[in-house]
A protein has these predicted regions:
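Active-site cofactor/cluster-binding pocket
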Residues: 1-151
Length: 151
């Protein structure tokens, strides 16, 4: 079982990124996948998180106590979820200087950073062989995702 937490703030595209992630895996693999969303204060800037579980057999609940991966679209939100970590939890954050440097040099619009980080994450977990671009529109978002997959 793989437990993944996407976290960030309202307006950063966390729900959009998780929808792309779950739909692509659901329609293109033999894995079971289940997710849940939690919106904080319903406004831009409020905390948002999505818990995603992937398994080869039935999943009975999308909620978990320990994350294998935390994907932090904000750079600071992962601190809020330290209670879901273990010594083996890997945190992938947009605050990583090498990721920021690559994103800035690509001169992509700021709103594509969620798909850039999603691309980096799917590459990290070796799932970049799925037809991700079929689920991502428009072209700027595809470019950001592909750039993330190269890191």
């Amino acid at each position: 079982m793989l437990n993944i937490l996407f976290c960030g703030k309202g307006g950063q595209g966390i729900i959009y990124a998780s929808k792309i992630f779950t739909e692509c895996i659901f329609y293109n693999s033999n894995f079971e996948i289940c997710s849940s969303e939690t919106h904080g204060i319903v406004r831009r800037g409020g905390p948002v998180q999505t818990q995603i579980r992937i398994n080869q057999s039935t999943i009975y609940s999308p909620v978990f106590e320990t994350a294998d991966y935390i994907v932090d679209f904000d750079g600071e939100e992962s601190i809020r979820y330290l209670n879901l970590t273990s010594p083996s939890t890997k945190i992938i954050s947009i605050s990583d200087a090498s990721l920021q440097h690559k994103l800035i040099n690509a001169k992509l619009p700021r709103y594509t950073s969620n798909l850039f980080l999603l691309g980096h994450f799917v590459h990290t977990i070796a799932m970049d062989n799925y037809p991700w671009l079929d689920y991502i529109k428009p072209a700027e978002n595809q470019r950001a995702f592909q750039l993330g997959c190269t890191l």
